[in-house]
Amino acid sequence: MNLEEIKRKLVEHKEELKERYKVKQIGIFGSYVRGEQQGTSDVDILVEFEEGARLSLLDIVGLEIELSDLLGVKVDLVEKGTLKPHIGRHILEEVVYL
């Protein structure tokens, strides 16, 4: 799977993710964006949830599993609100929002 295929699949399911998980914004960062992915690379996905969304840890893990199943590759899900300043700056510089 390449970056364009990942983007296409996520865009196709964006409304469903918004309804089910209250996803406000979703983007890809990391090795796939930089074109450095290997056969064992996971897909790094940054998500921001709608204000006031009440999601449990199980909901977030469920979203990560659903995205992994959808893309056919392991997904590492990162919530935008939990980014640490140092690493967060680098992620926000390279993220490709859909």
Predicted stretch roles:
Residues 28:
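Hydrophobic alpha-helical positions that pack around
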